[in-house]
């Protein structure tokens, strides 16, 4: 009995130590949770600041664009364009933006992410409509995608990868359309570009050669890009071919919007105009101006200098309105509703507490 009494304090000491360790573990766990909460709160604040900055910047750009529009010129452009022209332009705009959703769809497939198409379409449409107008697509488009995709478990690194893969889709489409137009309609393009026929054909052949080299690379090699610890596995041949088709379809639809708005009697074939449009887009992208504004228009005007300048300017103004400004305003409204709804739901969930279930 005495032995038991002597052992009892030892057992109590051991039990007390175990309890202390358990309390310490709970305390540390609580500290970790608190630190995680603090990190989430900081990220939420940063996200709110970025959201506010992007929305404010968007409305500033929108205000400036609207301020530069001459209402008389806009009215003249609308009067000179027929209802049929405007209707076809609207349809082609919708087709182009619908194909743009394929950019994100292919990228998500490559990254192994399964996201509902309605979410993909929303993220794609809003990100492109915003970045087309504001410029700097890696920043503006990436930010919008982060807003939409992050609640569905897609991390920032994968969103960056998605943006790069979508960019590859765009450039594959641009390259094949330009190369085809330069080779197939070299004579007409040479007249517009004021270059020699041989140079035009050679440029088109070089474009096809570059595309062939890319496809050989993705077929025979395991295409992986490593940049300072960031690793991206590029799509293989089958998915790359789908990328090229989607990109080409988008470029053709977008070019069609401007083509149908041009004044009648220009005698320019759509296939020839594709080369003019793609080169204008490339120069606009190189200028880093939002939507390539100014550079794009100047390139089109120089290439189509045989057409009435007023008519081409009117077509360009309508093109900016239908393809850029209207989708931009729609995207802003959609994002505003989306962000407001998400923040209201989050506030309601916090107010309800963990016992609401």
Role assignments for model-derived ranges:
Residues 118-122, 137, 141, 151-167, ...:
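Membrane-interface alpha-helices at helix entry/exit sites of multi-pass transporters
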Residues 147-148, 160-163, 168, 175, ...:
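Hydrophobic alpha-helical membrane segments of integral membrane proteins
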Residues 2-125, 174, 183-285, 307-317, ...:
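Predominantly cytoplasmic-facing regulatory/coupling regions of multi-pass membrane proteins
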Residues 98-103, 135-145, 253, 271, ...:
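Transmembrane helix boundary and interhelical junction motifs in multipass membrane proteins
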Residues 128-137, 167-179:
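Mid-bilayer segments of alpha-helical transmembrane spans in multi-pass integral membrane proteins
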Residues 117-151, 284-287:
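Hydrophobic alpha-helical transmembrane segments of multi-pass membrane transport proteins
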């Amino acid at each position: 009995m005495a032995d038991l009494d002597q052992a009892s304090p030892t057992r109590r000491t051991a039990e007390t130590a175990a309890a202390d360790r358990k309390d310490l573990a709970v305390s540390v766990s609580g500290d970790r949770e608190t630190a995680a909460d603090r990190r989430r709160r900081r990220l939420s604040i940063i996200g709110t600041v970025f959201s506010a900055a992007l929305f404010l910047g968007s409305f500033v750009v929108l205000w400036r664009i609207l301020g530069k529009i001459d209402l008389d010129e806009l009215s003249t452009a609308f009067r000179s364009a027929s209802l049929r022209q405007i209707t076809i332009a609207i349809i082609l705009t919708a087709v182009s933006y619908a194909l743009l959703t394929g950019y994100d769809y292919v990228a998500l497939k490559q990254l192994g992410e399964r996201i509902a198409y309605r979410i993909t379409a929303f993220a794609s449409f809003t990100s492109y409509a915003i970045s087309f107008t504001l410029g700097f697509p890696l920043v503006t488009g990436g930010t919008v995608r982060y807003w939409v995709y992050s609640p569905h478990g897609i991390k920032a690194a994968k969103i960056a990868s998605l943006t790069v893969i979508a960019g590859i889709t765009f450039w594959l489409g641009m390259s094949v359309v330009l190369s085809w137009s330069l080779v197939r309609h070299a004579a007409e393009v040479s007249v517009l570009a004021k270059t020699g026929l041989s140079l035009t054909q050679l440029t088109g052949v070089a474009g096809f050669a570059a595309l062939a080299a890319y496809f050989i690379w993705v077929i025979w090699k395991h295409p992986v890009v490593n940049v300072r610890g960031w690793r991206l596995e590029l799509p293989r041949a089958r998915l790359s071919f789908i990328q090229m088709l989607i990109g080409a379809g988008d470029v053709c639809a977008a070019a069609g919007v401007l083509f149908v708005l041009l004044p009648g009697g220009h005698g320019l074939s759509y296939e020839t105009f594709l080369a003019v449009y793609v080169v204008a887009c490339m120069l606009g992208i190189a200028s880093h101006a939002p939507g390539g504004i100014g550079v794009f228009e100047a390139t089109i005007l120089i290439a189509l200098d045989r057409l009435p300048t007023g008519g081409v300017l009117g077509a360009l103004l309508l093109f900016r309105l239908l393809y850029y400004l209207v989708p931009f305003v729609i995207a802003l409204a959609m994002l505003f509703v989306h962000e407001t709804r998400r923040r209201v739901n989050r506030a309601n969930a916090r107010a309800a507490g963990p016992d609401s279930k």
